[in-house]
Amino acid sequence: MKARLVPVYFQSGRDDDYNRQLEALRALLADEADIAEPVALGAPLPEADAVVFPQMLGDAFSQLEQIRAIDLPRLVITSEFGTMSMWDWEIRSYLRSEGIATIAPYNLSQTRTIMRALQVRRSLQRAKFVVF
């Protein structure tokens, strides 16, 4: 079982950088995650374990409510190394100041651990525990 991720993109749309990053994530996380087709931020999301932002843009400031409305873990994985790019800290910091939690791994090992945690989370939602 793999983690199911839905990539989202901002109102300014997808560009070549977004598409390159998405393909890099698919390659890096091929064993850990199934990455769906991208969805515009604010559009209905398919069933998934988390959303992933492969690219952070200034649009985040104007689309704050659409980000807040996401009822799944929000991953910020914006570098080709499977981590958060250093210049995205400002947007992430702003989101945090507005009460919006994000997960931004700082190395590929941590990213892969997050994928496994998402897999376990889904498994446990369907599990039944017997308590004596």
Outline where the language-model segments fall.
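An N-terminal assembly and electron-transfer interface module characteristic of large anaerobic redox
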Residues: 1-132
